[in-house]
Curated annotation (Swiss-Prot):
Keyword entries, A-Z: Repeat, Transducer, WD repeat
Record-given protein name: Guanine nucleotide-binding protein subunit beta
Signal peptide region: none
Cysteines engaged in disulfide bonds, as pairs: none
CDD domains listed in its UniProt record: WD40
GO-annotated biological processes: signal transduction
Family: Belongs to the WD repeat G protein beta family.
Job of this protein: Guanine nucleotide-binding proteins (G proteins) are involved as a modulator or transducer in various transmembrane signaling systems. The beta and gamma chains are required for the GTPase activity, for replacement of GDP by GTP, and for G protein-effector interaction.
Keyword Repeat found: yes
Native organism taxonomy: Eukaryota, Metazoa, Spiralia, Lophotrochozoa, Mollusca
SMART domains to which the protein is assigned, alphabetical: WD40
Subunit structure: G proteins are composed of 3 units, alpha, beta and gamma.
Xref: Pfam families: WD40_Gbeta
Length: 341
């Protein structure tokens, strides 16, 4: 039995090496070579324009609404707060049944928010009830591990990722799981929907990223390269690439059509993990939230650091860029959200 396993192990290693060689052969240029004639973006300096105060404990997640004005945040204080980013007013403060919340999401329509965490359940809240109060409109049980990330496709469909090593597509109306997406060999920490909503990418503690087709439920591609857990993942605005952030202190850029890693964003001085990543609207800048309380801004094409957003007194746990590209929000364990531009 052990000899059989060993033989199989060697065979998989050989196959992996063949794939690696094939990818190398297909890589006719590097990002650095291809962008040699591109001017660097220069120094990016952003200021804190708003500070959102109201949470009483660590903030774990935030997500902008598609109107680029409202945002939702989730904190260990057991509250989901919907904020008006222009006025800093709280539009809704939603007490949660479980305070161990790890993710939140705003529906594109603006009608719903969702959250979940160590309760293994994705809870959907309706913001537009006749009575004007916010209420749980649906609870989606089915994962056997914590909920790490959730994103709405529309008002009736949501995709979740979980510590049970799977992702899932749900019908919100019926509360049923439509598809389960397997293949990761570690906790799935993050997911990002493609701009066309037909695929999503996931990052996991097996240090790999996977691309799934939402319609047929199959893993189409697997991307390796990171040396530790992938905590965050986000699609490039055109849908042909995505970026990841990992505990190995690097962010990486993967090209879907080239089927491989094409860029790495790291610095000798940066030795802590990345909790969250987001692109600017054009995709030229990559923002990363770090355990060392900072948010680094990277020039995607030049693979150089272009700026730092410093202002939090604890780990930056989440960040997001508005759909109109005009602002970035950071959330932190210091219990504050900051809006920058």
């Amino acid at each position: 039995m052990t000899s059989e396993l060993e033989a199989l192990r060697q065979e998989t290693e050989q196959l992996k090496n063949q794939i690696r060689e094939a990818r190398k052969a297909a890589a006719d240029t590097t990002l650095a070579m291809a962008t040699a004639n591109v001017e660097p973006v220069g120094r990016i300096q952003m200021r804190t324009r708003r500070t959102l105060r109201g949470h009483l404990a660590k903030i774990y997640a935030m997500h902008w609404a598609s109107d680029s004005r409202n945002l939702v945040s989730a904190s260990q204080d057991g509250k989901l707060i919907v904020w008006d980013g222009y006025t800093t007013n709280k539009v809704h403060a939603i007490p949660l049944r479980s305070s161990w919340v790890m993710t939140c999401a705003y529906a594109p329509s603006g009608n719903y928010v969702a959250c979940g965490g160590l309760d293994n359940i994705c809870s959907i809240y309706s913001l537009k009830t006749r009575e004007g109060n916010v209420r749980v409109s649906r609870e989606l049980p089915g994962h056997t591990g914590y909920l790490s990330c959730c994103r709405f496709i529309d008002d009736n469909q949501i995709v979740t990722s979980s510590g049970d090593m799977t992702c899932a597509l749900w019908n919100i109306e019926t509360g049923n799981q439509i598809t389960s997406f397997g293949g990761h060999t570690g906790d799935v920490m993050s997911l990002s929907l493609a701009p066309d909503m037909r695929t999503f990418v996931s990052g996991a503690c097996d240090a790999s990223a996977k691309l799934f087709d939402i319609r047929d439920g199959i893993c189409k591609q697997t991307f390796t390269g990171h040396e530790s857990d992938i905590n965050a993942i986000t699609y490039f605005p055109n849908g042909f690439a995505f970026a990841t952030g990992s505990d190995d202190a690097t962010c990486r850029l993967f090209d879907i059509r080239a089927d491989q890693e094409i860029g790495m964003y790291s610095h000798d001085n940066i030795i802590c993990g990345i909790t969250s990543v987001a692109f600017s609207k054009s995709g030229r800048l990559l923002l990363g939230g770090y355990d060392d309380f900072n948010c680094n801004v990277w020039d995607v094409l030049k693979q150089e650091r272009a700026g730092v957003l410093a202002g939090h007194d604890n780990r930056v746990s989440c960040l997001g860029v508005t759909e109109d590209g005009m602002a970035v929000a950071t959330g932190s364990w210091d219990s504050f959200l900051k809006i920058w531009n």
